[in-house]
């Protein structure tokens, strides 16, 4: 890629405005997930499981697969941004496509997990804990799906227009968003699955 007006540069005025808007958005996201976590942990401590113990329902091998898929996707996303900074478009796209595929694996297993719980009679309607459980995980899953769609749109832009100073900052921003979702999942894994099994065990 030539070093002219198409050079990757995240310091454009538009890029700076996009970053500012993203940090404002991320602050709102922290507040959203913080509220959902606080609600779930309060209900978790109260033991309102409606007779459905998490130790009987949670499948740790499945949760570990989901966790590894999302954590590895964070790594592949980081590699993609590394190659973006090196202006190596094909390698950037390869690693970002891997990120999307791993994200789809995560979402697929989460849908399977929800379907399994519903088949066992566990729905948001049976109790306040399970309602908060489905809302928290469903919100995170929806955000992951949004991130996947966002990445795909940017990859289409890069494929059609090339990597340039306008889409490069957007790729960097979506990578931050993806890492944020990974951090949220680590908290979910710890608070919902690990601590949850202790409280209901």
Curated annotation (Swiss-Prot):
Broadest EC class assigned to this enzyme: oxidoreductase
Signal sequence annotation: none
Membrane topology: Multi-pass membrane protein
Biological processes, Gene Ontology terms: aerobic electron transport chain; ATP synthesis coupled electron transport
Localization per record: Cell membrane
Entry superkingdom: Bacteria
Record keywords: Cell membrane, Membrane, Oxidoreductase, Transmembrane, Transmembrane helix
EC number of this enzyme: 1.10.3.-
GO molecular function, one term: cytochrome-c oxidase activity
Gene3D superfamilies (alphabetical): Cytochrome c oxidase, subunit III, four-helix bundle
Catalytic activity: 2 a quinol + O2 = 2 a quinone + 2 H2O
Any GO CC annotation of this UniProt entry: plasma membrane
InterPro entries noted in UniProt: Cyt_c/ubiquinol_Oxase_su3 (IPR024791), Cyt_c_oxidase-like_su3 (IPR000298), Cyt_c_oxidase_su3-like_sf (IPR035973), Cyt_c_oxidase_su3_a-hlx (IPR013833), QoxC (IPR014246), Ubiquinol_oxase_su3_dom (IPR033946)
Membrane-spanning parts: 20-40, 62-82, 91-111, 133-153, 172-192
Protein family membership: Belongs to the cytochrome c oxidase subunit 3 family.
Free-text function comment from the UniProt entry: Catalyzes quinol oxidation with the concomitant reduction of oxygen to water.
Protein name in the entry: Probable quinol oxidase subunit 3
Organism: Staphylococcus haemolyticus (strain JCSC1435)
